[in-house]
């Protein structure tokens, strides 16, 4: 008996159910939209461009041509602890971020690339406030933002070949504390959630 949804007619359901059961939880420190993805498997109406900064930012990127499609080519999902650790080590191995001067534009490009290629919703790369070292809020992300010594900033800005638009030449204009920051890999961040210890108030709803 049974109609269209009888157990025997739903081919592949046991595999889907098992995949859902084994889905990893979202990492501590991800944003509200990623929590929706974890809990409901989709972004709900409680997180829209009108009330969620990450959703609004993503919508703006879709309207602007950024050089590659911003619709993910894989299923949308929240950043997990394991994925954050794996991504950190992948970027370290490829020489991607270590010592690179941080700017909001560079962070946006990285977030979009990860969203497009891996499907991780771009609300996970957030840091503790300054001044000083900024620690990642997402547990498992092993890159912190470290202030560059002022003499190194001055040295980098000497000469005629300096680009005024290079992040090091902007003297921290992106940063509320006006510090020039660089991404720095720290493997201990995979085991020690520094941000949670320094700012427990950010994790009340996690």
From Swiss-Prot:
Its UniProt domain note says:
The N-terminal domain is composed of the N-myristoyl glycine and of a cluster of positively charged amino acids. It is required for inner plasma membrane targeting of Nef and virion incorporation, and thereby for infectivity. This domain is also involved in binding to TP53. The SH3-binding domain constituted of PxxP motifs mediates binding to several Src family proteins thereby regulating their tyrosine kinase activity. The same motifs also mediates the association with MAPK3, PI3-kinase and TCR-zeta.
| Pfam families, alphabetized | F-protein (PF00469)
What does this gene product do? Factor of infectivity and pathogenicity, required for optimal virus replication. Alters numerous pathways of T-lymphocyte function and down-regulates immunity surface molecules in order to evade host defense and increase viral infectivity. Alters the functionality of other immunity cells, like dendritic cells, monocytes/macrophages and NK cells.
Q: Which GO terms describe its molecular function?
A: ATPase binding; CD4 receptor binding; GTP binding; MHC class I protein binding; protein kinase binding; SH3 domain binding; signaling receptor binding; thioesterase binding
Q: Where is this region: Mediates dimerization, Nef-PTE1 interaction?
A: 108-124
Annotated region SH3-binding: the residues are 69-78
Q: What is this protein called?
A: Protein Nef
Q: Where is the lipid attached (N-myristoyl glycine)?
A: 2
Q: Which UniProt keywords apply?
A: AIDS, Apoptosis, Early protein, Host cell membrane, Host Golgi apparatus, Host membrane, Host-virus interaction, Inhibition of host adaptive immune response by virus, Inhibition of host autophagy by virus, Inhibition of host MHC class I molecule presentation by virus, Inhibition of host MHC class II molecule presentation by virus, Lipoprotein, Membrane, Myristate, Phosphoprotein, Secreted, SH3-binding, Viral immunoevasion, Virion, Virulence
**Which InterPro entries does the protein's record reference?**
HIV-1_Nef_anchor_sf, HIV-1_Nef_core_sf, HIV_Nef
């Amino acid at each position: 008996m049974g109609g269209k949804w009888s157990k025997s007619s739903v081919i592949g359901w046991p595999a889907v159910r098992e995949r859902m059961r084994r889905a990893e939880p979202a990492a501590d420190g991800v944003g509200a939209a990623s929590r929706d993805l974890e809990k409901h498997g989709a972004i709900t109406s409680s997180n829209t461009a009108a009330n969620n900064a990450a959703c609004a930012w993503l919508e703006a990127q879709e309207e602007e041509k950024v050089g590659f499609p911003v619709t993910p080519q894989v299923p949308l999902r929240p950043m997990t602890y394991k994925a954050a650790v794996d991504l950190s080590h992948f970027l370290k191995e490829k020489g991607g971020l270590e010592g690179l001067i941080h700017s909001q534009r560079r962070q946006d490009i990285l977030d979009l690339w990860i969203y497009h290629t891996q499907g991780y919703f771009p609300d996970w790369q957030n840091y503790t406030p300054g001044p000083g070292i900024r620690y990642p809020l997402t547990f498992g992300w092993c890159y912190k933002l470290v202030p560059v010594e002022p003499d190194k900033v001055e040295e980098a800005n000497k000469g005629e070949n300096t680009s005024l638009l290079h992040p090091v030449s902007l003297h921290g204009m992106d940063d509320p504390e006006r510090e020039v920051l660089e991404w720095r890999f720290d493997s201990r961040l995979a085991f020690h959630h520094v941000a949670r210890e320094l700012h427990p108030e950010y994790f009340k709803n996690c």
